[in-house]
Regions:
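Short, contiguous pre-domain boundary segments
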Residues: 19-27
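An amphipathic alpha-helix signature
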Residues: 39-43, 65
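Active-site rim helix/loop that mediates acceptor-substrate recognition in acyltransferases
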Residues: 58-79
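Helix-loop element at the rim of GNAT/NAT acetyltransferase active sites that forms part
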Residues: 44-58
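A short glycine-rich, hydrophobically flanked beta-strand micro-motif that places a catalytic Asp/Glu
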Residues: 78-81, 151-153
Length: 194
């Protein structure tokens, strides 16, 4: 399959979701993770018991920093902080699922996009906000890479809340897969759900 030049499927900067067009309760945007600026915030979020239950990263600050540095250095994944009206409220890992170790565990297609989502503050959870943001960001991923036909998610299979959220965002629960660290629900959103 030919590569598209001049397109970085992981670059979703300069995009905005607004109440008028996207049903978001404010203006939402993504910015690259800045370790100096964001480490304390991400450490707090990762250590929130509700987040830690599924992210499994209730770690000391230094270990979170090491994990985030690895994300920044990845050649197939980009970490972002999501902001609502310029206030940080979410963490995103947007990646090429076909280039990720995950591809060994499902029938990967060339240019599959992948998404990991963490809503930080407890008051950002619920209210359907996660579904709206996941719908918007996954559409941005497909828009950014014309060769991508779908976005993949693989939350813990016991995370029923996120699986319901993903369904509201246009994802289908295709099957469960056994990963080395968890049993995951394989979720897929194709272009046909845009």
């Amino acid at each position: 399959m030919p590569e598209v030049t001049g397109v970085d499927p992981l670059d979703l900067l300069h995009r905005r979701a607004t109440p008028e067009h996207d049903g978001i309760p404010g203006t939402f945007s993504l910015r690259p993770l800045d370790l100096d600026r964001d480490l304390d915030l991400l450490h707090t979020w990762m250590n929130d018991p509700e987040v830690a239950r599924y992210w499994n990263k209730a770690w000391p600050r230094e270990q979170i920093a090491s994990y985030l540095r690895e994300q920044q250095l990845s050649t197939h994944s980009t970490p972002y902080v999501g902001e609502l009206d310029d206030v940080p409220m979410s963490y995103w890992e947007l990646y090429r699922a076909d280039l990720d170790p995950l591809a060994q565990y499902y029938d990967a297609r060339e240019h599959d996009a992948g998404v990991h989502l963490l809503l930080g503050p407890a008051d950002s959870r619920g209210r359907r906000l996660a579904a709206d943001l996941l719908r918007v960001v996954s559409a941005w991923q497909l828009d950014a890479d014309p060769l991508a036909t779908r976005v993949i998610g693989e939350p813990d299979a016991t995370n029923e809340r996120l699986i319901r959220v993903a369904a509201l965002a246009g994802f289908r629960h295709v099957t469960d897969i056994e990963l080395p660290h968890k049993r995951a629900a394989l979720l897929v959103r194709g272009r046909d759900s845009l």
